[in-house]
Amino acid sequence: EVTVKNTIPGQKVSFVINKKRKGKAEGRLLEILEKSELENAEANCPHYGVCGGCNYQTLPYEEQLKLKAGQVLELMKAVVPNAEDIFEGIRKSPQQFGYRNKMEYTFGDEVKDGPLALGMHKRGSFYDIVTVDECRIVDDDYRKILGATVAYFRAQDIPFYHRMRHEGYLRHLLVRKAVKTEEILIDLITTTQEIRTEEGSVDEQLLLDGWRNQLQTLELDGSIAGILHTKNDSVADAVKNEGTEILYGKDYFYEELLGLKFRISPFSFFQTNSLGAEVLYQTAREYIGDSLDEKAEKTVYDLYSGTGTIAQILSPAAKHVIGVEIVEEAVEA
């Protein structure tokens, strides 16, 4: 049995085996030779196939749901007796495109020594970055913010952080936008290294002020709640908070789910599909009995509770709800 990532059932592909273990193997995709009969949709995004973010855009959405249902059921069969009898299938997202409320973009280049890029990792590459300024899983405000940011820092010739040399300034751009309130939080993540270009040293505060001013001139559908600058000198290629300053506004925004309002900070966990989360949480509430009965005797434990979203949404259906979370920032939010 060989598993090949980034493929669709029914495709004819060429691949090389790069892992073997206990009678199973993993293969690395080289080329798609023939499409699957299931693929009758054109990819909605021009970056599809190059960007490593999405896998199934050439499948109609209903086929994507069937594929996911099969994958989940196989996982359940390994640990749940008679899984087929209790599995209820997949509930679809109310919105297929433009649904995300958070994106973490990475600075880099698409080819070695090429122009500054800002976006997602190229499929199969640890180093190359694709500028996803036409990405379809976010709305137009994200695309405008990304485009303005990469254009500004390109014009200033600001170096990105090289993951092998551990040199450079620009690391990530974090953008969060509430679907219901349309509030936007923008956070630039950089190192604390001196900013140097071919023309010499750059004043960081003037650079950040210019970026902030550029963002504030954008015509957006939503409203900017805050513009932030976070420092991160960790060697890991991940967004980490080693100190955040507010360049404009505040360091949080609000989102609404099922009639409740939630305060979200830059790094607190929140489901990335707000409308899909409402479906998820409403289903969970129905499972435990959405009685809204003041005499309810149930106690609900929300483990790994993050900002306590599930705990608060389930609270009308229980006498006590207890959230358990190790991340202090999420609890404080």
Regions inferred by a protein language model and the residue ranges of each:
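Residue-level signal for inorganic ion chemistry
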Residues: 10, 54, 173, 227
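Terminal RNA-binding accessory module
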Residues: 1-47, 123
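Short, conserved phosphate/pyrophosphate- and ester-handling motifs at nucleotide-, phospho-/glycolipid
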Residues: 10, 138, 273
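Extended interfacial segments that mediate partner engagement and assembly in macromolecular machines
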Residues: 33-43, 49-162, 180
